[in-house]
């Protein structure tokens, strides 16, 4: 045998794992049956957070390279998709926790002060490494989020906050996307023409519709013209950067263009993996938002208007965080600039050939 035998129990470290639950209600001589469930669900969250961080660190190391090989992109995409699957799984764990009734929870809740899920170092690491900036977070008890962590964790978190996040690294990767402009082709010139033609055709159709009253025509045309105006930022870098400075965009002008190109031409072989990566990042943001929302609903169900054990406003804080804590919002907002696939300008043959595989 090449390696010495290993026992299942020892390999999984089950002795320390299964003896890591220490209910406070038992310690205080007032055993509450559901406290063990409460502990195990939260310990399971932390185990899954550890796996998410393991996958996330791998993806970060890939995208922080000056160039990313196609094979590495496939691996990164698969690991991001694994993170999505884990996040969906932990959302399902809320169902298990909700088998505990509010009265069951009150049997031991007062014994937990001031412990709070807000103190989860691993969850804060996940958010920060993905790219949730301190300015995009809700203040917690009028203090920065990291102040709820232990002193050693605060130092580590401040160090992580000063390093490039996945959002930062993906932005730089997008900026390196080729194909946006060729020797005799500028994608954005052709896309602008297609957008203008689509809206002008719609405006002409409305104006020539004999069944619409003049007032309705004017209102519809004004709406179409306003929507067309929203595309200005896409074609005017100065206008885009002004909106970006106001916080309406986070990605750079070049990165936004690349992300839109990938979405519009995702069926091209060379863009299929980049599209999977963008979709996985969207899914991560969405599932994290869903998990926060389920957490907020559970807090309302368990606590009503009571404050949280960590001193927060409970349900209200969680609901507000659900609405505010977004990371890849620009990818969601890209759909603003979509036009029907039938009207997307075709790529020149030379560029389409470069995007394709040949045998």
UniProtKB/Swiss-Prot annotation:
- In its keyword annotation, does this UniProt entry include Iron? yes
The cofactors named for this UniProt entry are: heme
Q: How is the cofactor bound?
A: Binds 1 heme group per subunit.
- What reaction(s) does this enzyme catalyze? L-tryptophan + O2 = N-formyl-L-kynurenine
Residues bound to substrate: 38-42, 109, 309
**Which GO biological process annotations does it have?**
L-tryptophan catabolic process to acetyl-CoA; L-tryptophan catabolic process to kynurenine
Give the keywords, sorted. Dioxygenase, Heme, Iron, Metal-binding, Oxidoreductase, Tryptophan catabolism
Ligand binding (heme): 295
Per the record, the domain of life is Bacteria
Q: Which GO terms describe its molecular function?
A: heme binding; metal ion binding; tryptophan 2,3-dioxygenase activity
Q: What is its EC number?
A: 1.13.11.11
Q: Which residues form the signal peptide?
A: none
Q: In which pathway does it act?
A: Amino-acid degradation; L-tryptophan degradation via kynurenine pathway; L-kynurenine from L-tryptophan: step 1/2
Its biological purpose:
Heme-dependent dioxygenase that catalyzes the oxidative cleavage of the L-tryptophan (L-Trp) pyrrole ring and converts L-tryptophan to N-formyl-L-kynurenine. Catalyzes the oxidative cleavage of the indole moiety.
Query: What is annotated about its quaternary structure and interactions?
Result: Homotetramer.
- Homology family: Belongs to the tryptophan 2,3-dioxygenase family.
Name under which the protein is recorded = Tryptophan 2,3-dioxygenase
């Amino acid at each position: 045998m090449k390696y010495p035998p290993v026992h299942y129990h020892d390999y999984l470290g089950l002795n320390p794992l299964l003896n890591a639950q220490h209910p406070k209600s038992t310690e205080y001589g007032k055993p509450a049956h559901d406290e063990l469930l409460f502990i195990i669900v939260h310990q399971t969250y932390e185990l899954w957070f550890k796996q998410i961080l393991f996958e996330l660190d791998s993806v970060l190391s890939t995208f922080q390279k000056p160039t990313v090989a196609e094979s590495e992109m496939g691996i990164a995409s698969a690991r991001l998709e694994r993170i999505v699957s884990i996040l969906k799984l932990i959302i399902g764990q809320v169902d298990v926790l909700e088998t505990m009734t509010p009265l069951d929870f009150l049997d031991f809740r007062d014994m937990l002060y001031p412990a709070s899920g807000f103190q989860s170092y691993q969850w804060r690491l996940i958010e920060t490494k993905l790219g949730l900036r301190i300015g995009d977070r809700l203040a917690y008890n009028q203090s920065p989020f990291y102040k709820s962590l232990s002193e050693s964790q605060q130092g580590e978190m401040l160090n992580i906050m000063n390093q490039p996040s996945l959002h930062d690294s993906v932005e730089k990767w997008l900026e390196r996307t080729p194909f946006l402009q060729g020797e005799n082709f500028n994608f954005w010139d052709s896309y602008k023409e297609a957008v203008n033609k689509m809206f002008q055709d719609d405006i002409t159709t409305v104006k020539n519709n004999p069944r619409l009253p003049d007032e309705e025509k004017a209102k519809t045309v004004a709406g179409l013209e306003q929507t067309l105006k929203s595309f200005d930022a896409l074609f005017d870098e100065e206008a885009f950067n002004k909106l970006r400075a106001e916080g309406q965009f986070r990605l750079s002008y070049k990165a936004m263009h690349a992300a839109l190109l990938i979405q519009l031409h995702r069926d091209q072989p060379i863009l299929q993996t980049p599209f999977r990566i963008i979709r996985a990042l969207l899914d991560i943001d969405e599932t994290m938002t869903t998990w926060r929302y389920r957490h907020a609903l559970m807090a309302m169900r368990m606590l009503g208007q009571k404050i949280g054990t960590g001193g927060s406003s409970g349900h209200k804080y969680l609901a507000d965080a659900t609405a505010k804590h977004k990371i890849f919002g620009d990818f969601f907002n890209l759909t603003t600039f979509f036009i029907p696939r039938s009207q997307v300008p075709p790529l020149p043959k030379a560029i389409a050939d470069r995007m394709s595989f040949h045998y």
